[in-house]
UniProtKB/Swiss-Prot annotation:
InterPro entries xref list: FluC (IPR003691)
Species the sequence originates in: Shouchella clausii (strain KSM-K16) (Alkalihalobacillus clausii)
Protein's name according to its UniProt entry: Fluoride-specific ion channel FluC 2
MF term (GO), any: fluoride channel activity
GO biological process: cellular detoxification of fluoride
Regulation of its function: Na(+) is not transported, but it plays an essential structural role and its presence is essential for fluoride channel function.
Transmembrane spans: 3-23, 31-51, 57-77, 92-112
Record's bilayer topology term: Multi-pass membrane protein
GO cellular component, one term: plasma membrane
Chief location bin: membrane
Residues bound to Na(+): G67, T70
Family of the protein in this entry: Belongs to the fluoride channel Fluc/FEX (TC 1.A.43) family.
Record's catalysed reaction(s): fluoride(in) = fluoride(out)
Cell compartment(s), UniProt: Cell membrane
Gene: fluC2
Amino acid sequence: MMYVIIGGAVGACLRFAVSECWLKFGKNAQLMTAVFVINISGCAMLGWILAKPLPEGIELLFISMLGGFTTFSTFCMEALELWRLKKRKQAMIYLVISIVGSLFGFLFGWNVRA
């Protein structure tokens, strides 16, 4: 249980830090862009972690960290906000590239370590 608590807290702090840095240093950056990068990189890291066995506690710590780092709920909120603002094409593109990008990110991470 402690691994889950620590991992989730670390992941949430990392997500906050990446989002803040993205907004501060990115050219015309939007939070949506930071969420996209966070989710794709988180999937790639998860693929890397799961490609080969790790000690149980370490694996649980990393999976919990990535659960706190990635943010499916914010992704959904942003996609629905685009849809609500009648930016339907942008919403669909965001949905597709996020889902496909996350799948390919996971495969990339898996293949790097496998």
